[in-house]
């Protein structure tokens, strides 16, 4: 955990790939962040794209690209932008909580928020979120973050509570997904799918077209 934006809030990095990568050469990073001051400037991430989802609260973003336009962000909405784009965040609620996927342009990401109640299912049933068509990815990462409530992993005899995260890598599964059952009485979860390019891959920046 560390502060961001000169005390604008706290950021919690949960996962990066590769796990041994430095702050400038990872392919993708997943984190959560609080937004706690009325107005702040987002941290810049040159050579990356940002996929920002507001989970709780609401903000207004001033985005400076060839002039200024404004994006209103309500709870649950998704906001994608270039990591080197100046973005000013203005709270429209007392505070906000968000998830961030910061990734190289050749990495594809997709996410959603689900409310689960009184269910039991195999983990592989959960991991059905469609990705970008015709993706060249050969490696998928699934991230499940518990926003509220709890999830029980029956075959693992463990329980995930608020703030816990499950990472499943399709090349080296940490769970036997076809046999691993999750169950819950009530939970709200964040689920992301990350499609990584075919190996050999490079973590160095690649050019992308500007709008």
Predicted regions and their residues:
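Jelly-roll (double-stranded beta-helix
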Residues: 1-211
